[in-house]
Design a protein with these regions (language model features):
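Vicinal oxygen chelate
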Residues: 1-2, 35, 46, 89-130
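A short, acidic/glycine-rich surface segment
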Residues: 32-33, 40-43, 62-68, 101
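Acetyl-CoA-dependent GNAT
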Residues: 59-63, 127-130
């Protein structure tokens, strides 16, 4: 097996319009493609994150909630590399997003913090190494 990289991360949201606005307008991800599948009553939104990375945002009628606290099995969080965590936190807070206090990774010495998407999915901002 010759795995090169992660191709995409798929997220199922409860409110498509709200989540689309969050990821495109608030976080600034670029829309690659948007498809509505009538037979599934479902949208699929392909978003570009940086260069060569994608998030697929899906909507389904009445998706079941996934427990995430306390530390349920499965995806724990999705992390985004940023050049300046403090600046990114300020931008999010100016847009009304609640952000946890900035912490220092004891293993790398890098700054990081967490916030959540509209469905409560934990998202991390991790400062790129210098």
């Amino acid at each position: 097996m010759d795995i090169k990289q992660i191709h995409h991360v798929a997220i199922i949201c409860s409110d498509y319009k709200r989540s689309k606005a969050f990821y495109t307008e608030l976080l600034g991800f670029r829309v690659i493609a948007e498809t509505y599948r009538a037979e599934r009553e479902s949208y699929k939104l392909d978003l570009e994150v940086g260069k060569g990375h994608q998030i697929e945002l899906f909507s389904f009628p009445n998706p079941a909630e996934r427990p995430s606290y306390p530390e349920a099995r499965g995806l724990r969080h999705l992390a985004f590399a940023v050049p300046d965590v403090e600046k990114s936190v300020q931008e999010l807070q100016e847009k009304g997003v609640a952000v946890e206090d900035i912490r220092i990774d004891p293993l790398t010495g890098q700054k990081f913090t967490f916030f959540a998407d509209p469905d409560g999915l934990p998202l991390e901002l991790y400062e790129e190494g210098i």
